[in-house]
A protein has these predicted regions:
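Transmembrane alpha-helical core residues of multi-pass small-molecule transporters
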Residues: 32, 76, 144-149, 174-182, ...
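Transmembrane helical elements of multi-pass membrane transporters/channels
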Residues: 9-10, 111, 145, 178-182, ...
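Hydrophobic/aromatic end-of-helix segments at the C-terminal termini of transmembrane alpha-helices
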Residues: 10, 17, 88-91, 152, ...
Length: 373
């Protein structure tokens, strides 16, 4: 969903705002991804606890986990807004001396991070719905956010109709408003459709043991998702010494990779609460069956992604830039890197299964082997 929004923004600005805008987005991406990793990772902890508790028949604790998780997610959003806005200028200077790129990056990221609390709360609701098995609700919610973002992009970027032309800032506002509409949808559904868990002030009294369980999955989950940001930042530093075009290529690749991973990630998201519920109910044989079925499905999806990258790499790169040299170099890079897609389906599925079982640390170890080694 996050990548889909970025794709919409970047396809609109690529010709009219220049490749500097693409470079700025590529440099901002690691911090933006890190902020999202914290929100999504902690949300995975919420979803896992809800599913395990419901599987064990403990609805009261599941409701406490949802309420605690929502409150803590809102707090995370406030901290992310402050921290990311303060860090971004110094972060951009590490990778470029181009004043225009730095200015574009700061303007875009400041607006995006002002919506951080909306985003963390939104993702918390998403994981609560997933934890109780309401996958269709989250799918529609993501579509609401995505479609509204795609519609708003050209209106705010180019100034169509009554809207002013805002350039890259318009892309950032469109992304933020997409998150707002997504959250509003979840709030409406929660009010009109009863869930197995209830959010209530009476559950806000701090439960240290429950909070510890949320973070025991949430922190490793966030680190799992943040590891690509660390890798991208390190690679950006190396590539910036050679050419700004290489930074653009890396940024495009990671967005394409995430987009291609979306179907597999969606299946893994569906697997987590099902595994957690059955684990809580003591159905261990069913847990194994769910894992192997998910692994096979993810493998097929990643094989298709590999074939696409091998056959039409130029067209994929051309979605983000019109620079012939960037497209030519990107084609070669994409064909080489996609060789690891199929193997990565094993680690992606294993991490999701371990998180669903509440074993966040083991999941983190698997991710560390994938990214750091």
């Amino acid at each position: 969903e996050i990548t889909t929004r970025l794709v919409g923004s970047e396809m609109c600005i690529r010709d009219r705002i220049s490749e500097n805008a693409m470079t700025a987005l590529s440099l901002v991406y690691p911090i933006q991804n890190f902020a999202n990793a914290i929100a999504i990772g902690f949300g995975i902890g919420i979803s896992a606890q809800i599913a395990i508790c419901l599987g064990a028949g403990n609805k009261e604790t599941a409701s406490k986990a949802a309420t605690h998780g929502l409150a803590l997610s809102a707090l995370h959003g406030v901290l992310l807004t402050i921290g990311c806005i303060l860090v971004m200028p110094g972060f951009l200077v590490l990778f470029t001396s181009d004043a225009d790129v730095i200015d574009l990056g700061i303007r875009y990221s400041t607006i995006v991070f002002l919506f951080a609390t909306i985003n963390t709360t939104n993702l918390s609701y998403e994981k609560i719905f997933q934890g109780v098995g309401k996958m269709k609700v989250t799918m529609i919610g993501l579509m609401v956010g995505c479609v509204s973002n795609i519609i708003l992009d050209p209106l705010l970027i180019f100034g169509i109709g009554p809207f002013p032309a805002m350039g890259i800032e318009g892309a950032a506002i469109a992304t933020g408003l997409g998150q707002v509409f997504n959250l509003v949808f979840y709030l409406i559904v929660y009010k009109i459709q009863p869930l197995q868990v209830r959010l209530s002030r009476k559950y806000l009294h701090p439960d240290k043991a429950l909070i510890a369980r949320l973070y025991s999955v949430g922190i490793p989950g966030a680190l799992n998702l943040a590891l690509p940001s660390v890798l991208v930042s390190a690679l950006n530093g190396l590539l910036a010494a050679y050419s700004q075009s290489y930074v653009v290529i890396l940024g495009i690749y990671y967005k394409l990779q995430t987009f291609l991973y979306l179907p597999a990630s969606g299946i893994v998201q569906g697997m987590r609460p099902v595994i957690g519920y059955n684990y809580g109910a003591g159905e261990h044989k069913r847990v194994k069956k769910i894992y192997y079925v998910t692994l096979c499905m993810s493998g097929v999806i990643m094989l298709v992604g590999t074939i696409i990258c091998l056959t039409v790499p130029g067209q994929l790169m051309g979605m983000f830039t019109t620079n012939p040299e960037t497209i030519a170099a990107g084609k070669t890079a994409l064909r080489i890197i996609c060789a690891g897609f199929l193997v990565s389906s094993v680690s992606v599925t294993a991490c999701g299964a371990l998180e669903g079982l509440g074993r966040g640390t083991a999941s983190l170890v698997v991710s560390l082997c994938r990214y750091l080694i």
